[in-house]
Amino acid sequence: MQQLMTLLSPPLSHSSLLPTVTTKFGSPRLVTTCMGHAGRKNIKDKVVLITGTTGTGKSRLSVDLATRFFPAEIINSDKMQIYKGFEIVTNLIPLHEQGGVPHHLLGQFHPQDGELTPAEFRSLATLSISKLISSKKLPIVVGGSNSFNHALLAERFDPDIDPFSPGSSLSTICSDLRYKCCILWVDVLEPVLFQHLCNRVDQMIESGLVEQLAELYDPVVDSGRRLGVRKTIGVEEFDRYFRVYPKEMDKGIWDLARKAAYEETVKGMKERTCRLVKKQKEKIMKLIRGGWEIKRLDATAAIMAELNQSTAKGEGKNGREIWEKHIVDESVEIVKKFLLEV
């Protein structure tokens, strides 16, 4: 990832003036003014972080907030979504869903650039935050890669220590943060989320997932040394499938063995996605135990309504209406209060 670091330049000084915030809910204009580090040592620049496991709606919420707290821009902290060219594989938020909000470190690097380390992400994201704050814009960081989130926000960061490695102690989590943070955790109860994720895999396949995975397939790549985008769920599973059934065989008739192998591959991808949820949630809980103040938002009802494609709990509301009421409105109030704090 050496070539990525050439994008870095000396960090900008923080003006530390956060944006004038307007909302669509008729609230008065909110102004939060903070002096820079040189003016008052106890005042830190403000950053909003949206975290959570895969498939909970983090990207959607980041756009919802950015369009209500203008001017705001979004910084991606998903380690797979930094890559371009494989938008279905990495489940990158499509342009038409970005709401016209500028996104940083999203679909920016080629897979051949290598793997971005937490230390490199810290440098790149810090530069983006500095530029936004100096332009009086609110930085909204969004992503479920907890190693990136910890690296970016921790006041004390050791690139040689992985605080989420098996057996690592709680003391490896730095509770002192570099910024004054409002951290929102979008959560969904596992049985509902697992069904949603399985459906999402099916939708990704319909959108061309297998074709993109075929482009990534390289028979000479050591399966034990996966780096960068090749760590994305689905790559390993379909690599095994493509070794037996190369893509050029698609025009032929699928026998029972091939159909069974394909179905087993898709099943393995779904199961691995659900296991990832458990790992991500464990890391979030470790951050909380380590002293991070994280506000949980329960999006279960909204996701369940989307699954049912009808009503939730007899209220006659669709998933988007429930999302607006229980996630967006609550988040707006939390962020408004956060921006008013000195």
UniProtKB/Swiss-Prot annotation:
Name of this chain's protein: Adenylate isopentenyltransferase 6, chloroplastic
Function recorded in the entry: Involved in cytokinin biosynthesis. Catalyzes the transfer of an isopentenyl group from dimethylallyl diphosphate (DMAPP) to ATP and ADP.
Note in the entry: Due to a nucleotide deletion that would cause a frameshift, IPT6 seems to be a pseudogene in cv. Wassilewskija.
Positions contributing to ATP binding: 52-59
Record localization: Plastid, Chloroplast
Coiled coil: none
Feature: transit peptide: 1-33
Catalyzed reactions: dimethylallyl diphosphate + ADP = N(6)-(dimethylallyl)adenosine 5'-diphosphate + diphosphate; dimethylallyl diphosphate + ATP = N(6)-(dimethylallyl)adenosine 5'-triphosphate + diphosphate
One annotated GO molecular function: ATP binding
Expression (tissue specificity): Expressed in siliques, at the mRNA level.
Annotated organism of origin: Arabidopsis thaliana
InterPro entries: Dimethylallyltransferase (IPR039657), P-loop_NTPase (IPR027417)
Family: Belongs to the IPP transferase family.
The entry's keywords: ATP-binding, Chloroplast, Cytokinin biosynthesis, Nucleotide-binding, Plastid, Transferase, Transit peptide
Record's GO cellular component terms: chloroplast
Transmembrane segments: none
EC nos: 2.5.1.112
Domain of life, per lineage: Eukaryota
Lineage of the species this protein comes from: Eukaryota, Viridiplantae, Streptophyta, Embryophyta, Tracheophyta
One BP term from GO: cytokinin biosynthetic process
